[in-house]
Amino acid sequence: MCLAAIVAACTSKPVEQTWVKVEGNKFIAPDGSELVFRGLCFSDPVKLVGEGQWTERYFAEAADWGANVVRFAVHPANINAMGWDATFEAMDQGIEWAKQHGMYVIMDWHSIGNLKDAKYTNPMYNTTLEETFKFWRTVAQRYKDEPTVALYELFNEPTVTGPDTGTCTWDEWKGIQEQIIDTVRTYNPNAVCLCAGFNWAYDLTPVAVAPIERENVAYVSHPYPMKREQPWEEQWEADFGFVADKYPVICTEIGFCLENELGAHIPVISTDVY
């Protein structure tokens, strides 16, 4: 919480690992040690470019906070508005800044809804299976030699319980994620793929009986405070925490707002008890 090796001929020295990888329920750093990711989810790169905030200073501040990973939340509407070439050029620069400050990058296809039925909770998240595969082909090809882009978050928040979000079973969603992973692996066999469950990437209970059948994967949860009533801990364990007994789990979104704060909305409203 990825695997690449260069085999040198005629040598008995250990092979150098340059990528983060999954071993059991842990993320393993290139030096072989366990890696715990602590980081920040950035705003969409296109949004930050437009606001003049996609700068080295922004990344330096994240590193000063103690982050060892940052998340690029790429909204389908934004990449299409700015253009794919310009967006990826901006992300190229961001990756260099992350590397400069000793941080990894999570590449996140930031949609919310039902990819199978192409039903989404807001027009900014509208995409298609074809476009989603295109995005991950582009990422995997462009960054196949860039270990800094260590984690590929395949789909931000799948849900079929929002208004007009269609239907999708776990088996169907599992199959789609496995197809995306296979596409990634065609171009980059090394990146760790992050897989989410339903209920806006909160619920991982189906993993107990039907895990993703691919190697070098980890799971995502977004345990915002209003997903469950207090006390949270036992419910978190039942809903997603148990997965960490066998596989790495990373919370790529987590946090809260006070009820009267700017940005407060369901499901993030809580107090500092959270």
Q: Where do the PLM segments sit?
A:
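Bacterial N-terminal signal peptides
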Residues: M1-I6
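N-terminal carbohydrate-binding accessory modules
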Residues: C10-V69
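Extracellular glycoside hydrolase catalytic/binding regions
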Residues: W19, E51, F133-L151, F155-Y274
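Residues embedded in well-ordered beta-strands within globular domains across many folds
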Residues: G39-C41, R71, E153, L194
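Feature marks short, surface-exposed loop/turn motifs that line or immediately flank catalytic pockets
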Residues: D44-V46, A73-N80, G113-L115, P158, ...
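Aromatic-lined substrate-binding rim segments of carbohydrate-active enzymes
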Residues: W54-K116, E131-F133, W173-N188, A264-Y274
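Short glycine-enriched, charge-decorated loop/helix-capping segments at active-site entrances
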Residues: W84-D85, T121-N126, T167-T169
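Active-site-adjacent "subsite" loops/lids of carbohydrate-active enzymes
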Residues: D117-T138
